[in-house]
Each structure stands twice: as structure tokens, then as C-alpha cells.
């Protein structure tokens, strides 16, 4: 049987997403940490005390960092999807999962994409 993975776009985020993976998986932690930007991803994704996770400039990097972490967990477990797809922003995560670019590059491209949205 072949496996397909569909990466979510903006709108699937919620406070606490990825926290259990981060605490239990070195692969998730390494991928997530490589996505560092100019704000505290951990605080926004895991706690969101300021309620900013639903603001686009935070949502998109958090979603991509989370997806990169999940991709790392799948790889760590030997799961190799035959098909990858992404919905809107999820396309960046699917491309990262396909090896087109690294987790850090996916985050950098997401940040660039955000800069274009705010022009």
C-alpha cells in the first residue's frame, strides 16, 4: 500500500500544537528548532499566551515549523510517503518533505512570502 501525506495550510493551527512531539522526539525538536525566526516559535506554538497564533505573521511560520517537525518524525520512524501534497501554505511543507529544500529554507521562504503579502 502506498502512503500519501497532505500538509495543511493556514487555519489548522491551535495552541499547543507540536508540544508533545517536541518533548518526546529528538527528530521533531531538531527540525522545529532549525526554523528559528525573530520571535519565539516555542512560546507561540506551545502556549500562545498573547493570542497571536491566529495572526498570519505568526501562523504561517508556526505551521511550516510544525510540518517540518512531523516530517522528521515520519522519517525517523522509517515512513516514506509515496505522494506529498500541500494545501496553500502546506505546499512549502510538502516541498520540504520531498527534499526540495531544508526546514530552514522552508521557513525562510515562508518569511519572504509573508513580506510579499504585506506589500
Residue ranges and their predicted role:
Residues 1-117:
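FabD-like malonyl-/acyl-CoA
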Amino acid at each position: 500500500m502506498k502512503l500519501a501525506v497532505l500538509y495543511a495550510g493556514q487555519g489548522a493551527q491551535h495552541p499547543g500544537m507540536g508540544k508533545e512531539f517536541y518533548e518526546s522526539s529528538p527528530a521533531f525538536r531538531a527540525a522545529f528548532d532549525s526554523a528559528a525566526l525573530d520571535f519565539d516559535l516555542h512560546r507561540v506554538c506551545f502556549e500562545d499566551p498573547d493570542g497571536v497564533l491566529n495572526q498570519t505573521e505568526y501562523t504561517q511560520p508556526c505551521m511550516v515549523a510544525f510540518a517540518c517537525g512531523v516530517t522528521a518524525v515520519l522519517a525517523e520512524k522509517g515512513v516514506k510517503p509515496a505522494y506529498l501534497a500541500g494545501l496553500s501554505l502546506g505546499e512549502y511543507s510538502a516541498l520540504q518533505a520531498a527534499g526540495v529544500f531544508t526546514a530552514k529554507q522552508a521557513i525562510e521562504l515562508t518569511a519572504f512570502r509573508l513580506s510579499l503579502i504585506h506589500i
